[in-house]
């Protein structure tokens, strides 16, 4: 489906099996069957309790110890979860998981927070359900689609 039930985002990786149907010589055509399928799927998704998922990134920041607090605070502000913190020779390595949507502009922000002395890397980790408050905001921004 191109326009899903939650904020209009596309529905992916769903298998649908048609169990029964009927046709009529006058009213049955390809477009009518497509519309019936769309309405049936939207109704099924509403009853199933669909969720919006977002990609979560594994983020590793390397920073001088003096900037550790500022960088951890910034990761928390971005809905990040701090995992391991490792320190050696006045350098901290902060491992965290952060939603991809919150990482835009991070390269500029981490340089600003650390006077250009920190670096980071990130890679895809997994998907998680978007928090309800953010779903509500997305629904509002995208024109009122919602469950």
Q: Model features per residue range: what roles?
A:
Residues 1-147:
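Accessory interaction regions appended to the cores of large information-processing enzymes
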């Amino acid at each position: 489906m191109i326009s899903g039930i939650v904020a209009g985002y596309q529905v992916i990786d769903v298998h649908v099996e048609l169990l029964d149907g009927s046709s009529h010589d006058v009213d049955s055509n390809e477009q009518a069957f497509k519309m019936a399928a769309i309405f049936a799927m939207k109704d099924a998704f509403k009853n199933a309790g669909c969720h919006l998922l977002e990609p979560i990134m594994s983020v590793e920041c390397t920073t001088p110890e003096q900037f550790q607090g500022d960088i951890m605070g910034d990761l928390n502000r971005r809905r990040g979860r701090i995992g391991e913190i490792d320190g050696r020779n006045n350098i901290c390595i902060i491992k965290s998981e952060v939603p991809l949507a919150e990482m835009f502009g991070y390269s500029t922000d981490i340089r600003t927070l650390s006077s250009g002395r920190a670096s980071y890397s990130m890679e895809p980790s997994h998907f998680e359900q978007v928090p309800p408050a953010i779903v509500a905001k997305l629904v509002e921004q995208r024109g009122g689609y919602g469950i």
